[in-house]
Amino acid sequence: MDELTYQIAWTCLYPTRLRTIKQWLEQYGSASAAWERLDVEGKKAALDRAQQEREWIDKHDISTYFYQDDNYPYRLRECIDAPILLYGKGRLRVNEGKMLSIVGTRQASERCKSLVRQLVLDLKEMVPDITIISGLAYGIDVAAHRAALEAGLPTWIIPAHGLDRIYPTLHRDVAVQALEKGGILTEYISGTEAEKLHFVARNRIVAGLADAVLVAESKQRGGSLITAKMARDYDRDLFAFPGRPSDDSMTGCNMLIRDQKAQLIENARDLVNAMQWDPVSQPMQTSIFTMPEDITAEQKKILELLQESEDGIHVNLLVMETQRPYSEVAADLMMLDMMGTVKSMPGGVYRMKVES
């Protein structure tokens, strides 16, 4: 039997006793050497199961990542409770580029799903070597994966089960697409079902793999706050989208920001600046814009303000700058949008539409 079989056997024997396994391996130098010195009940059954898994791995072209090996994700290895062994499927480049985990509620609002999509699309332009990580759950998770696929970015799925199944099955198409450029990474052997405790355990992988974690939408008792706490425990940068005080689905995000546990961001530029990542320089383009003739003086003022901002301006700031009622500014923006001169962005931001 090879070393990998013994590594699997240890995780079959003690699936939750990570420190115990690490102590044995560090004392005797290898999984096989430590196994030979072990005398406990269940040893033979664990080794038999490991041999079955070893055959399954070969048959299905599964990659493995042992915590003492060079190919193990170095960010995750820093975490005290990092898995002993990981199983991966797809094209996983675990130690290349930047890593962002995006988490949030399963009952996600269209607004926050749109914010996630725009953030990921913009990150593709600013930091194209980034990977998007999440758990394939309903709501924010799958929105993050889909945005990454749309942008052509690698995305990693971290499930709470083995690689012989997909949960939820409704998202199988997303998982299949993710294999083309990213992949699926888990600590669970085949046959492992998605149980409640497994979801909590996998959250530490979602947090530990990343340079930064974004909580896009969460209530005060949302499961995403568990991932947020783990991210802080691992000294990862933590970010959150802000919400209105009346938004029940954003109370968790607002609490993280209020308690100074997470940094407030509204878009990709905020994230890139906070992380001090060097954005890719975009080629200079000559923007062609002709001021429409059949517009009011108030609409012209709005266009002049928008021309001065590359990133766009929030509608509330336009109200302040023009010193006009919100309803009037919003009506003018709608008219200009219909005319094709401005573009409405997520979060109440407006930009100029220009031709290059």
Language-model region placement:
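Glycine-biased, small-residue-rich flexible motifs in mid-sequence functional cores and linkers
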Residues: 1-4, 66-356
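Short, small/acidic-rich helices and loops at N termini and domain boundaries
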Residues: 1-71, 256, 339-341, 346-348, ...
